[in-house]
């Protein structure tokens, strides 16, 4: 399966060598951006069979339903019968999913399947190329009962209409930093529970040593609150997120030290004059990075920028704007949450050189 599936291109490497290679990727990206690399780079690697999030392709063939990832360099889908990366709870659900999807009128030729393993169990978002009819809903209900799935949601492929709930059997919940919330269907979560904790800790460790009561922190691309909620235990947080359902999940917690605003940062970035008022800016942008937003951060010149990256190439491009604006790279953490994939996570702290701004907020 490894030789055909396009998911794990580096499975021939042992895990220590893989982590060392990815640490080198991050270091090279930051050097290319114009920074000296700190001597002490912390690193963490998730164990196999721990990934709790899966985006899978579905194809109807003459033999039945195929569920898996695209084959290397192809649009063909490799049927996933085993996986060294995914959590066993996801892999073990695939046979029943194949059986049910084969009977659905909604799956004419193709579908997409997004599975999140939450504290409440599997949460499934099914996107199909044909409408969902009444008998399809009945079959999905039977599937949910068989696998004890709290919620199955559905939407049309490539349609502007939002998802709808097809089956709801029980409450859906996930605990983030000690706070229980309900993520929307298909919500972005860090790939594993272990890496979520590691990223949260790396960001908290990257905060200035003393954050006083007057310190202000702006968080960009907040999602459901993976970073907002633990940061809110340390200081006042102004969180921005462009996806309203994710922001609604964060708001539902009602954490008084976290205020949140819905804003598409790729189309309407926070301006430099506002960012410059913050003592710390934390951002966790999408895979493509945050070119326009980074330009405003460089103009605003907040004292500290903590950047969480899942793409070394985008990190290099974005960080180069900080290098040109006079920032120094102080700390780097590498988190390998994408085992045997070229992708890796990194948490970097940048400090503005020769800051003349008062740091009373950081010490009182």
Identify what each model region corresponds to.
Residues 131-364:
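Rossmann-like S-adenosyl-L-methionine
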Residues 2-110:
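Extended interfacial segments that mediate partner engagement and assembly in macromolecular machines
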Residues 83, 125-134:
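A short interface-forming secondary-structure element
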Residues 115-129:
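Carbohydrate-binding surface patches
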